[in-house]
A protein has these predicted regions:
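PRPP-associated nucleotide enzymes
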Residues: 1-144
Length: 144
């Protein structure tokens, strides 16, 4: 990746939005363009096992350096779905960064960058939510 190359950063909405924003503000020496994917697989504190695609990227990622930005990897179901479909577009390079990885599951998705790893707690804040609540907390906490 050279100084003239561009990273195509793809944010998985809604949970990743705060992490994505902070990350993008700190990538200063490279050109970056943004795309957004809006998917959901949770209801309350449980995975439904079904992926609901609400919106998909609207720009080509063919032959581009793609950085997929995720908030938390738990079961990996949502991430597996997204990765499988994005790789069909044949990006030049494909990397995944997740703010949080839960260590309890073998999700089967190799992550290139991880902020931190946690036990199996339901987290809220900094974009993470329960039924759309607590996303706006400026910190990450867990629910008992």
């Amino acid at each position: 990746l050279g100084k003239t190359d561009t990273i195509h950063a793809v944010c998985i909405l809604k949970g990743s939005v705060h992490f994505f924003s902070d990350l993008m503000l700190n990538i200063r020496k490279l050109n970056v363009k943004y795309s957004f994917i809006h998917v959901s697989s949770y209801q309350g504190t449980s995975s439904t096992g079904r992926i609901r695609v609400k919106s998909w990227i609207d720009e080509s990622i063919h032959d581009e350096y793609v950085l997929l930005v995720e908030d938390i990897v738990d079961t990996g179901l949502t991430l597996q779905y997204i990765v499988r479909y994005l790789k069909k577009y044949n990006p030049r390079d494909f990397r995944i960064v997740s703010l949080i990885e839960k260590t309890v599951h073998d999700h089967g998705v190799p992550l290139d960058f991880v902020g931190f790893r946690v036990d199996d707690k339901f987290l809220v804040g900094y974009g993470l939510d329960i039924d759309e609540k607590y996303r706006n907390l400026p910190y990450i906490g867990y629910v008992e």
